[in-house]
Amino acid sequence: MRAVHFGAGNIGRGFIGETLAANGFGIDFVDVNDTIISALNQRGEYDIELAVPGQKKIHVENVDGINNGEHPEKVVEAIKTTDLVTTAIGPKILKFIAPLIADGIKARKDADNKQTLDVIACENMIGGSQHLKEEVYSHLDDDVKAFADEYIGFPNAAVDRIVPLQKHDDPLLVSVEEFKEWVVDESQMKNPSLKLETVHYAPDLEPYIERKLFSVNTGHATVAYTGKALGYETIGEAIKDEKVLTQLKNTLKEIRSLLLAKWDFQEKELEEYHDKIIGRFENPYISDEIARVGRTPIRKLGYDERFIRPIRELKARGLSYTTLMETVGKIYHFDEPKDDESQKLQKMLKDEDLKDVIVETTGLKDDADLVAEIAASVKAAD
């Protein structure tokens, strides 16, 4: 069996690639990073290092690379016969690979390949695969859309594994935490007979996606923004500070109240899940930089993102969101010279009225009360 995977970066190699290889797949990695693609083609294998005592290694083989910038036709050829397509490239890049996937689907139709195929976007976003489907369908004619409706699935997925910023002499070596979770919405699959070991298949993915995004992503960002405000440079340093740890624990408590109100989770189950997350952030073998975890603050302030969405939903239910709101105030002070969004946000705050900036970044144009609360939080964080 073969898989075409878009994104040969650390998550692609260190999580999705590892899982696919462990399930017996050969992998065609697709990327524009020529250093990585060339190394994959020269060696056909790479190592993953687990961030645990002894730094256990996992060996991955039967892999190659395709530079989609130079050889888009090879990507189309690979999709024509592949058994699975996955992505780990970042939500904003999905639209750029959509034409290639569309051409691959057309090639399958032209070759009369009626083997069902699932395309799984493994991204930090809600509804990633369905978003990719919309982008792909915008490049399809009606007859190919009809073919895709019958044979091509776009099941949403939730993925979770911390892969810190890292540098190695070997461009293919990647260090990852031991914990990993990959959940796929089986109700959206076209090829449900192809199930991967260590991947969890659920009839409804939304509870798992929200649990992950509002716990891991919100929690990680909370440590970053609180730590930055206190002058720390790494997550590991920051979380040793009792103020940061308390902020994280109180945030997760607010998130628990929302998840319990919305979904069929058990309180003890969520408490254990959140304790595990705190332990992951405290892992001394993963040194993640606050600059990386906190980057793109404008995106992270989005209406459906990791802070504003849970705040909106907690407010609608009359539940507390005090700690989440405190962190939101700190995000507006995240001044990271190397991050373009951070610098754009600081310029907006200098040039525009604070409440206008809040509406622009959060999309809260219909909730003046919440905008006022955020403005107060921003001022309190001065």
UniProtKB/Swiss-Prot annotation:
Disulfide bonds: none annotated. InterPro entries: 6-PGluconate_DH-like_C_sf, 6PGD_dom2, Mannitol_1_phos_5_DH, Mannitol_DH, Mannitol_DH_C, Mannitol_DH_CS, Mannitol_DH_N, NAD(P)-bd_dom_sf. It holds the Pfam family Mannitol_dh. GO terms for cellular component: cytosol. Its EC number is 1.1.1.17. This is Mannitol-1-phosphate 5-dehydrogenase. HAMAP family: Mannitol_dehydrog. GO terms for molecular function: mannitol-1-phosphate 5-dehydrogenase activity. Keywords: NAD, Oxidoreductase. It comes from the Bacteria. Belongs to the mannitol dehydrogenase family. It catalyses: D-mannitol 1-phosphate + NAD(+) = beta-D-fructose 6-phosphate + NADH + H(+). The gene is mtlD. GO terms for biological process: mannitol catabolic process. The keyword NAD applies. It comes from Ligilactobacillus salivarius (strain UCC118). PANTHER family: ALTRONATE OXIDOREDUCTASE-RELATED, MANNITOL-1-PHOSPHATE 5-DEHYDROGENASE. The keyword NAD applies. NAD(+) binds at A3, V4, H5, F6, G7, A8, G9, N10, I11, G12, R13, G14.
